[in-house]
């Protein structure tokens, strides 16, 4: 019996030693968890030119972030299409949504976001209704874009810097609500225009922008400014028609199509000023230069489109919020945190509006003159004063 116990003990010891010396099985690397972000882009309809920039910027953001999976949906140019696109994104089980273009679209999507309990970052639309929805209890909605008031603040800033004899306000009829809200703030901060006029979409009235351009060109003087409230491609045609009819002074654009240096060079559009969330010359964070350089390298064109840059920043914000607090605490993290984008450092107020106008997040005004873009605002990045035609 004693011998049996000795043999049994030796067997156990051998098994134990062999077990300890067996090579460990390699563990399979766990795939990195990602936040699934739905992106509403206007691939069709009135705003399709902005849709291209928005999609490009979203893809670049996912590449830079590394922890984002994208799902795209075409929101077209109507609230109905935007809602259908949002519902598709929800069916794809996204964790958050960014995008849509117009204010009517964003309002419908904001309601749907609250109903479906999906975080929604408004990256373009400016209506004050968005903030009102938050105060009424919809905590799922945040806005990274300017509100309508800040669009007016920037235009008034340009007028204060340029000191024109008079200014004219030319709006775009499909965006009349936005334009009128912006103008109300300009009136408050600077004063009323010599004339307020709107041109219709070419799909409704093909020659209307030509008629308005001629009307303003006949009235505006050498030291007058034209505030142009159309960010789309028709603004290019308006500018060409205005100058062809002898239009003088400076045109200040809300950006978009007339904020692209390549376009301005091609048009030889000297004395055209514009707003942008950021410019390549304004290194607000370490993402600014990276965004502009990588966008141009990847897509072969300039990245000054406002809707594109704000789409990029919105996705980068969601990436950082996910990294800080996870999917379950997106709202709490967005409400309390600060987030880095190409345009600056984002924080949100009690109405979930990004704090544009704060020290770390300011819009930018550039002027195309002598073949290049000069920064005229904010002062810490200014490379020139406003230049008038001689």
What are these model-derived regions, one by one?
Residues 1-30:
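Secretory targeting signatures
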Residues 38-57, 73-79, 101-102, 172-177, ...:
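Extracytoplasmic "Venus flytrap"
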Residues 43, 62, 138-204:
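An alpha-beta-alpha
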Residues 49-54, 64-132, 144, 201-207, ...:
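Beta-alpha junction/loop-to-helix N-cap segments that form part of ligand/metal-binding clefts
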Residues 82, 143-168, 208-209, 235, ...:
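Hydrophobic alpha-helical segments within soluble ligand-binding/sensing domains
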Residues 113, 118, 179-277:
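Extracellular/periplasmic bilobed ligand-binding domains
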Residues 239-312, 379-389:
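Extracellular/periplasmic periplasmic-binding protein-like sensory domains
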Residues 298-305, 319-375:
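Segments of small-molecule ligand-sensing domains
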